């Protein structure tokens, strides 16, 4: 688990200080992936450096597996860092070493005996799908394959957490999908707590269990990913699964409906309309993939006379989650447009 408590980082001397991280709180449980998103200058890179204490926070704590790294001396901090695997946009591979030799480096530095190193490297390359490429040099590998070598190296010392800082930036869509798929496997198989820092919103829906939005050094939104997608007021949800094609509600009450496409019957709208005895108007819809699962969003226009409890019950029985939109959309006549 990763726990960041009131994490603050400032530069300069008072009164001319610049605050890059401002009392930031974030928890990444074991066996989960939390994505941190935000514009350039939001503080994402500084956050990554503070998690590993490559940059020491001005105040606050960085707790990894129950241990506050900010309270450790140099020797114990080196030991604690072994529990944090890191992967970056640059794979950082040594060009004159093979894939196997690159993965072996942390084991060699730690003094692991050769026989155990060989066995561990073979396990790791197999884990990341590169068992047949152990003797290849970095220039003989694709960008996605090099990043997989970097992941194998990050796992060499059996960390409990993994920090991914823009690790998929610059990769083509196929390579990106393979890396996010691998991270999900590592989450499930090894129970890792993964902090996934990125500016690529399309990647978030493929990998994250939760998402936090960072702006000006502060977390302004943080929630499980599906909750973010269900929130019509969420800027992150709107960016990840846009509400496309919303039409006129004609004086109807607007409802937002969310669902996992694989669990919902194709005729849910017509079936619910027949059951309720009211026509439900489809104003807009979109479908996407979130962490490997199909999810959808629909905007409905619902007659004001319809009992909301009956509507939610009818949709719940079909595997849909519904909530009213913040306001009722007036008809064109009410707006004096006709």
Predicted regions and their residues:
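Catalytic Walker B motif of ABC-type/P-loop ATPase nucleotide-binding domains
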Residues: 162-165
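Helix-to-loop junction immediately C-terminal to a conserved catalytic motif
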Residues: 52
